[in-house]
Curated annotation (Swiss-Prot):
Gene Ontology BP, a term: photosynthesis
One Gene Ontology cellular component: chloroplast thylakoid membrane
UniProt cross-references to InterPro entries, sorted A to Z: PSII_PsbN (IPR003398)
PANTHER family in UniProt: PROTEIN PSBN (PTHR35326:SF3)
Similarity section: Belongs to the PsbN family.
The species this protein was found in: Ipomoea purpurea (Common morning glory)
Protein name: Protein PsbN
Reported function: May play a role in photosystem I and II biogenesis.
UniProt gene name: psbN
Amino acid sequence: METATLVTIFLSGLLVSFTGYALYTAFGQPSQQLRDPFEEHGD
């Protein structure tokens, strides 16, 4: 395979992995540990 093809596949996989991890952190199991500053502000 050509170098450009391998770099493109690597960067695409990296982007998909990062997006999946961000969604898991935002909406998955670890999201229960995130604090909500709007709920802390008792107004």
